[in-house]
């Protein structure tokens, strides 16, 4: 690693030393020596020493069941500590001093100034800026909350140690705390013993909001204002809302039978309780601060004559928040509320108005410094979080709505809705939506499945407008899918319009998105209720699983482009909602690059994007890291709108069409076309064993008896990441590029790399995947776990992978992967030394596990789970 990363090197070394000290203390010298020997063999094996490689295999293959857990834990915990050090590096003083990121807001405003950008245009674009992060509980977070808390404290210690003026005594105190935290982590079980409930997942999300985003959002808004003021010459409005937080936790019932209407209601109550708790803490501190006596005449007229007018207002709010806390505490405990709704705070404006009045009065009386202190932070929090802490999305699969309406139509004698043509469905739905009479008979008893759908709609009807952000329909295929949800919401008595969002996920559905939305927009009733606003969700994970990375990404691009053009033509304001994950197979890419690779004008109404599983912690888990993440998102959105990427040339489109067809055929030829593929996949990866790891509340399969097509995209990608073949992220992509180059179109491919962010980002993502893949390790899985007659599949895939790596290197004119990002290459090289033993241990453990699955040694099962979480930590992005 370069000199710039000396702090990172030193921190990793120190954390490793403290971990060794902990292991020696807890397990004894013999275990520590065994671990150290494995580490040295792994390092030498990576350096090309064949004898060391064989010795590594022999050592790990002969390890006793008794010793296997501490060995697995040692390498897993070191990788977690490396992640902490790397996360800290991005926010360290050294990093800040060494480079002002070219992707930051401040650098963007410098470029805008250099290019004489219109102040008016910049002002309009900044005022429209919207970053809406949707937190999801997808089961890719393999680290327990108990450990996450300790990891945050370790990060704080690293921050303190970076101060160069520490005395030896002060340094020793911090290092002792660091050692203790590492020891606490070692003696904490890293594997959950029970699968979290949806309510547990929601509490995890709210804890992250409280511990990180509550501090980060006001700080980011201050930085945004300061940076914009340098360019604009004036402050942004206090009421600006450039950040919004939404959540799927407690609302996403797609394939998760444990998310019920009752769970949704409980999570909504808990969110309001937590918001009241956090605002009460803020308001109590504010009551101490606002001891000023002077206020404006308007303020005095509105709130009365008081010696300390601001305190009077703030104390009233404190009383209301205390009552709010009690009210929702009673609801959560199933007690009759002790206070009435008239005594509590239910809407943002009940908090905003009196506090904004305080703010304006303080400004008017020359107390700007005080107004811009804690009070401004609270106003920013009201704008972003509101009194519900976050908005909730409801998500359900399209056929569940079809089945519910079909049950109704059968009962009332209209026939089976599910069997009707699309035209007949639409005609029926539009007729019922326009009718004033109810469709559902009062005393009807539906099936439990339909009752659950109706109960969910009733919970929505009980909420005030704005609490539910939208209703997302997964696997949306037709205009009737959207109209059906509107009808169910109408029948439940929802008194206002809720955005109903189709999620287009498969290749065919993405290609049909424009046609489906055109049909919807042609429905007069529909145009009348949407108020010329439409949200559409683009699915990244299922489309990549369906067609491969290259074909899926081009389908996503084309769908977005078509929807932008369609809505512009009709005067409809379009928000694109991106369902991305952390991995390449699920649309993951560095945030800035990913956003600048979107079609022109697709971000003009802001960004709505899912933040999933482990990526929430990596990108938002610490206040300073979250501020950096918001800065990158804001800078990319503003750049995409003010300095838009080029429209792709016709010849580039033609090449992408060819790449898409070729890559999809190759991908599906393997995944769907080879009868041996499913048994090979099940043997060569820990896919079946993954279901034993209690990561999230949602089952891994939509249909427990199905094949790959029934497997959720997340475990599909997670499994391939474990055996280092990383297949979903590259299969078909490199081979299609190679075919196009062999057709004599290499010059066009090179121009696309140099001049088109969409294409260059795809190549960069492939390079990152290739640098984390490992054909030798993948071969070990095959040789120990796969029947010989299936070995040909692994051999063919590894040959394709090696050929694809050479193809990508020919585009970058480099001899090594990641040559242009040496510190990432160094980071991967360092991780490999610790991840390789975990992979080889996993092979050994899977072999032992599968030999006698009915009588598995508990130590073997526990160690296997540890290797899964350890490899996830080593790879950084799991699913």
Swiss-Prot record:
Reported EC number(s) for this entry are 4.1.1.31
| Cofactor(s), names only, from the UniProt record | Mg(2+)
Q: Which reaction does it catalyse?
A: oxaloacetate + phosphate = phosphoenolpyruvate + hydrogencarbonate
Residues at the catalytic site: 138, 545
| InterPro entries found in the cross-reference section | PEP_COase, PEP_COase_bac/pln-type, PEP_COase_Lys_AS, PEPCASE_His_AS, Pyrv/PenolPyrv_kinase-like_dom
Q: Which UniProt keywords apply?
A: Carbon dioxide fixation, Lyase, Magnesium
> Where in this chain does the entry annotate a coiled-coil region?
none
Disulfide-linked positions: none
PROSITE patterns given in the database record: PEPCASE_1, PEPCASE_2
Pfam families per the UniProt record, alphabetical? PEPcase
Tell me a GO biological process for this protein. Answer: tricarboxylic acid cycle
What are the protein's GO molecular function terms?
A: magnesium ion binding; phosphoenolpyruvate carboxylase activity
**One Gene Ontology term, aspect cellular component:** cytosol
Entry function: Forms oxaloacetate, a four-carbon dicarboxylic acid source for the tricarboxylic acid cycle.
Q: What family does this belong to?
A: Belongs to the PEPCase type 1 family.
Q: What name does this protein carry?
A: Phosphoenolpyruvate carboxylase
């Amino acid at each position: 690693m370069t000199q710039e990363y000396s702090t990172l090197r030193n921190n990793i070394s120190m954390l490793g030393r403290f971990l060794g000290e902990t292991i020696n203390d807890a397990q004894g010298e013999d275990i520590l020596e065994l671990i150290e020997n494995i580490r040295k063999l792994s390092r030498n094996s990576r350096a090309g020493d064949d004898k060391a490689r064989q010795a590594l295999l022999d050592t790990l293959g002969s390890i006793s069941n008794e010793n296997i857990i501490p060995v697995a834990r040692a390498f897993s915990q070191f990788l977690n500590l490396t992640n902490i050090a790397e996360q800290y590096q991005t926010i360290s003083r050294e990093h800040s001093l060494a480079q002002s990121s070219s992707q930051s807001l401040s650098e963007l405003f410098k470029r805008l100034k250099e290019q004489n950008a219109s102040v008016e245009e910049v002002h309009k674009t900044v005022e429209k800026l919207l970053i809406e992060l949707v937190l999801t509980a997808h089961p890719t977070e393999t680290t327990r909350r108990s450990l996450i808390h300790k990891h945050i404290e370790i990060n704080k210690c690293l921050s303190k140690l970076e101060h160069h003026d520490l005395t030896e005594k002060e340094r020793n105190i911090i290092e002792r705390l660091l050692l203790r935290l590492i020891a606490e982590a070692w003696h904490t079980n890293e594997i959950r013993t029970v699968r979290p409930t949806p309510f547990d997942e929601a509490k995890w999300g709210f804890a992250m909001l409280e511990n990180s985003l509550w501090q980060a959002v006001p700080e980011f808004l201050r930085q945004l204002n300061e940076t914009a003021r340098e360019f604009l010459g004036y402050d942004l409005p206090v009421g600006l809302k450039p950040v919004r937080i939404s959540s799927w936790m407690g609302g996403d019932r797609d394939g998760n039978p444990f998310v019920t209407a009752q769970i949704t209601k409980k999570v909504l109550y808990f969110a309001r309780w937590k918001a009241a708790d956090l605002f009460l803490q803020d308001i109590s501190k504010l009551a101490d601060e606002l001891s000023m006596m002077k206020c404006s005449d308007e303020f005095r007229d509105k709130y009365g004559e008081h010696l300390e007018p601001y305190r009077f207002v703030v104390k009233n709010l404190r009383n209301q928040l205390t009552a709010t806390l009690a009210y929702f505490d009673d609801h959560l405990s199933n007690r009759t509320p002790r206070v009435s709704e008239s005594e509590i705070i239910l809407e943002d404006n009940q908090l905003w108005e009196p506090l904004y009045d305080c703010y304006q009065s303080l400004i008017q009386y020359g107390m700007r410094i005080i107004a811009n202190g804690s009070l401004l932070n609270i106003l920013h929090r009201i704008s972003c979080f509101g009194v519900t802490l976050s908005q909730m999305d409801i998500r359900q699969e399209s056929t569940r709505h079809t089945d519910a309406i079909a049950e109704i139509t059968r009962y009332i004698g209209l026939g089976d809705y599910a069997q009707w043509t699309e035209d007949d469905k639409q005609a029926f739905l539009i007729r019922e939506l326009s009718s004033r009479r109810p469709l559902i008979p009062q005393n009807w008893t539906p099936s439990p499945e339909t009752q659950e759908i109706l109960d969910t709609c009733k919970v929505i009807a009980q909420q005030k407008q704005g609490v539910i952000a939208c209703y997302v329909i997964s696997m949306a295929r037709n205009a009737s899918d959207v109209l059906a949800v509107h009808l169910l919401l109408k029948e439940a008595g929802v008194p206002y319009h809720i955005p109903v969002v189709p999620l287009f996920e498969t290749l065919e559905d993405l290609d049909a998105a424009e046609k489906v939305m055109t049909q919807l927009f042609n429905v007069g009733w529909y145009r009348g209720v949407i108020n010329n606003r439409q949200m559409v969700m683009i699915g990244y994970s299922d489309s990549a699983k369906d067609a491969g990375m290259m074909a899926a990404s081009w389908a996503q691009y084309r769908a977005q482009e078509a929807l932008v053009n369609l809505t512009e033509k009709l005067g409809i304001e379009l928000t694109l909602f991106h369902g991305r994950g952390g991995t390449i197979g699920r649309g993951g890419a560095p945030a800035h690059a990913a956003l600048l690779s979107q079609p022109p004008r697709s971000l003009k109404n802001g960004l709505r994007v899912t933040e999933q599983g482990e990526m929430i912690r990596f990108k938002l888990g610490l206040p300073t890291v979250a501020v950096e993440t918001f800065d990158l998102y804001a800078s990319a959105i503003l750049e995409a709108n003010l300095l838009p990427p080029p429209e792709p040339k016709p010849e580039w489109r033609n090449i992408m069409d060819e790449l898409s067809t070729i890559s999809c055929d190759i991908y599906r030829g393997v995944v769907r076309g080879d009868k041996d593929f499913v048994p090979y996949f099940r043997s060569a990866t820990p896919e079946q064993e993954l279901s034993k790891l209690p990561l999230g509340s949602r089952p891994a399969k939509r249909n427990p008896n199905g094949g790959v097509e029934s497997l959720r995209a997340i475990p599909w990608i997670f499994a391939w990441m474990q055996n280092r073949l990383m297949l979903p992220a590259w299969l078909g992509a490199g081979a299609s590029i190679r075919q196009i180059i062999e057709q004599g179109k290499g010059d066009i491919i090179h121009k696309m790399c140099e001049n088109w962010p969409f294409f260059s980002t795809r190549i960069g993502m492939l390079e990152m995947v290739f640098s984390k893949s490992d054909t030798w390790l993948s071969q070990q899985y095959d040789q120990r776990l796969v029947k010989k007659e299936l070995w040909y599949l692994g051999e063919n895939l590894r040959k394709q992978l090696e050929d694809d790596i050479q193809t990508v290197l020919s585009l970058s004119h480099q001899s090594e992967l990641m040559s242009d990002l040496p510190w990432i290459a160094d980071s991967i090289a360092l991780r490999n030394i610790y991840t390789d033993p975990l992979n080889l241990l996993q092979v050994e453990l899977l072999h032992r596990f599968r030999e006698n699955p009915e009588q598995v040694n508990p130590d073997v099962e526990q160690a296997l789970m540890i290797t899964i979480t350890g490899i996830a930590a080593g790879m950084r992005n799991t699913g």
